[in-house]
């Protein structure tokens, strides 16, 4: 089975590579900052991405139909258990669960227009352009795989992520300032996870993938929150003892203040 998966992956890469013509465009991009600092007062922010599509040679012609841009931002990976509940005899009960393995904790997909106006449905699925087209590995009994797009667990997983601002899809999220210069704003909610974020920009024209470029940024804790996090990781035993002592002292102080004579 492993051999078959490897052969399928090679075939997919060959298909994608075959859809990219000889380099005629070069993508240059930059982001406004590579590090975002958060503390207890963090309410969210955004990162601005700028880029340009340049001919790779003086003889390359500008595309008559213009360029299309798709920006994908993926946060730290995590494993999530999605549970489905039903009301039985007046009580909400878990009736099923699904484990999503190593999926992005944050995922944003930004483009300059809807995907069906950029390329064919088959290419949209092949390149995994939209949220609905992304592969989310799941634990299915003893097997690991993805399921159909309208699977209720998968749909609910994406819906809940979008409600918290952790999954975003905006088909007007990329602005073409000129036919070759573009701008995109990456929204980061207050609950954005700490860690590294990968940014990928893909250029398409006439429905075909022409070029891609990658960048990255990170979200870090600063101030007292960072001190506490470091203490918990590096001095686990001491941190646990200190926390327990503080809880005991707080309880004792409250008992003294509010006791009745």
Predicted region positions:
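Sec/Tat signal peptide C-region and signal peptidase I cleavage site
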Residues: 19-24
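Membrane-proximal low-complexity regions enriched in glycine and acidic/polar residues
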Residues: 87-193
């Amino acid at each position: 089975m492993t051999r078959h998966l490897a052969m399928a992956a090679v075939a997919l890469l060959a298909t994608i590579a075959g859809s990219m013509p000889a380099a005629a465009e070069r993508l240059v991009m930059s982001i406004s900052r590579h590090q975002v600092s958060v503390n207890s007062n963090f309410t969210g922010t955004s990162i601005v991405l700028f880029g340009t599509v340049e001919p790779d040679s003086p003889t390359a012609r500008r595309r008559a139909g213009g360029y299309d841009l798709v920006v994908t931002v993926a946060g730290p990976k995590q494993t999530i258990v999605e549970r489905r509940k039903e009301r039985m005899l007046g009580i909400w009960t878990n009736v099923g669960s699904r484990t999503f393995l190593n999926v992005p904790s944050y995922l944003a997909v930004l483009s300059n227009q809807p995907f069906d106006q950029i390329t064919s449905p088959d290419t949209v699925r092949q390149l995994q352009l939209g949220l609905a087209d992304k592969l989310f590995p799941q634990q299915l009994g003893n097997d690991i795989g993805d399921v159909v797009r309208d699977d209720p667990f998968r749909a609910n997983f994406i819906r809940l992520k979008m409600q918290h601002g952790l999954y975003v899809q905006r088909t007007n999220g990329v602005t073409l300032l000129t036919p070759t210069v573009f701008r995109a704003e990456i929204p980061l909610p207050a609950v954005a996870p700490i860690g590294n974020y990968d940014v990928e920009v893909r250029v398409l024209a006439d429905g075909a993938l022409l070029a891609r470029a990658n960048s990255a940024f990170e979200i870090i804790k600063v101030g007292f929150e960072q001190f506490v996090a470091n203490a918990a990781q590096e001095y686990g035993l001491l941190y646990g003892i200190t926390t327990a002592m503080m809880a005991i002292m707080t309880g004792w102080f409250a008992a003294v203040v509010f006791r009745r004579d």
